[in-house]
Amino acid sequence: MRNLISVGGPQQGVFGHLLDYGAYETFIQRTDPNKRKEYQRKNIFLTDLNCETTCNSTYKNNLLKLKNFVLIKFLKDEKMQPKQTSWFGFYAENDTNTIIPMEKTRLYQEDLIGLKTLEKSGRLHFLSINGEHLHLPPGVRNNFKLIFYF
């Protein structure tokens, strides 16, 4: 894979009251800033992928092979809480009023999966779309192909 475009993806997980009903079932994996220990114990996907419990160097090595990693956030997104998760941001622990941007996270600062290296080398891109979750204006997909595939 040369380029990875994540369109409104929950990089740091999602949070919200609807997820209270089965947050740690095998088909639902939410990130709860108020129950961080439980999240780290029961979430079998993001804790591994984002090096929150252990770190698999293969994840970093594979990400660093990318020519471009594009993170797209929807500015009017009400499905993803917080919408900054699309750019690896998330709520502060035990504080759903404060958003920690990617640059202030351990994941970035310690370069656990290669985000810092990608950004410093100009291969990590942040795009925003003035719309609701996954509502792409006409022609946007083709613009992404032109910018990042050639």
Please name every model-derived segment:
Residues T31, E52, F90-N94:
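Surface-exposed loop/turn and secondary-structure junction residues enriched for glycine/proline
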Residues Y59-F150:
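C-terminal catalytic-base region of ester-bond hydrolases, centering on the histidine
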